[in-house]
Amino acid sequence: MNIHEYQAKEILRSYGVSVPNGRVAFTVDEAVEAAKALGTSVCVVKAQIHAGGRGKAGGVKVAKSLEEVRTYASELLGKVLVTHQTGPEGKEVKRLLIEEGCDIQKEYYIGLVVDRATSRVVLMGSEEGGTEIEEVAAKTPEKIFKEYVDPAVGLQAFQARRLAFNINIPKKLVNQAVKFMMGLYQVFVDKDCSIAEINPLVVTGDGKVMALDAKLNFDSNALYRHPDIMEYRDLDEEDPKEVEASKYDLNYIALDGNIGCMVNGAGLAMATMDIIKYYGGEPANFLDVGGGASEEKVTEAFKIILSDPNVKGIFVNIFGGIMKCDVIASGIVAATKQVGLTLPLVVRLEGTNVELGKKILQESGLNITAAESMADGAQKIVELVR
């Protein structure tokens, strides 16, 4: 789960991690009032969306007067911001962070992620702050330094200090930087983060180490332990289809193609998308209905797939183990009738009660194309949507 920058900074502040003073605003008047309350000569007006690259897209403005705050807030609120992370459709700006300006002397990058290769949290740092870390990794990987954290003891101060020296934090500010990194690590662990990224971390003219921007992502599987984090969820920033799917414990991710997929099991779902691509088609989604799909769940899955106007056909690929093929077949028939499906539908069933499942489909009287194998099904749906 993602949250906004201002929310991430609230969490960091509660752990003693240094961030600029700022206030969130939902209207132009609130933005002006926030700037007044800050009482600084320079304010930064920052668009709040769940995407990076806001500065390059014109989503961050420096205001030197209340009138400029009003002007920039008017420009940004309601604007569709397109960045390299939003896709061409962009995201509408519905809230702003009004923040005090900083006298930036130097920018750095600090981040925490889980390294799957070592099964450890890794603390990363670079003095190439303010740019995409992926770009730095591709062009100048030697400028990224890493410290691997032993989960038994956690991040040690000597590791944070070594990283601070490696990325050339001024010596007089190393202790500040160490405190910053230790606090960031504590947030990462306590809140079950998947990413904690500060880009840039800045050194200011008055000798402070501060998070100028902050990104926290959380492990969705651990959110049941964090009702406080769940309160930060902004459904406006999420795909409505994905939100609806989560209500029924369906794993749905929207893609750009025109062939809707309904599959049980993440591995089979990925293989299904691959084979559709192999035969020249484009999957419209990843949809895993799980191992215990009911008739209601299958119906909702169909509704979610069909809510995508780009979908021109549906491929249902089910291997019945825990889930029985006759239950899935009954669900498919009921869902097809309920939603009034007119698009091509190809169904491949295999596993428990497969013959009974196929019989239910054949006797339904509906226009359902049966497939004998995954490859056969993929070829048929690709041909039908052409």
Swiss-Prot record:
Binds 1 Mg(2+) ion per subunit. Its EC number is 6.2.1.5. One of its GO terms (cellular component) is cytosol. One of its GO terms (molecular function) is magnesium ion binding. Pfam families: ATP-grasp_2 (PF08442), Ligase_CoA (PF00549). Mg(2+) binds at residues 199, 213. Keywords: ATP-binding, Ligase, Magnesium, Metal-binding, Nucleotide-binding, Tricarboxylic acid cycle. Belongs to the succinate/malate CoA ligase beta subunit family. Succinyl-CoA synthetase functions in the citric acid cycle (TCA), coupling the hydrolysis of succinyl-CoA to the synthesis of either ATP or GTP and thus represents the only step of substrate-level phosphorylation in the TCA. The beta subunit provides nucleotide specificity of the enzyme and binds the substrate succinate, while the binding sites for coenzyme A and phosphate are found in the alpha subunit. Heterotetramer of two alpha and two beta subunits. This is Succinate--CoA ligase [ADP-forming] subunit beta. It comes from Geobacillus thermodenitrificans (strain NG80-2). The lineage of its organism: Bacteria, Bacillati, Bacillota, Bacilli, Bacillales. The gene is sucC.
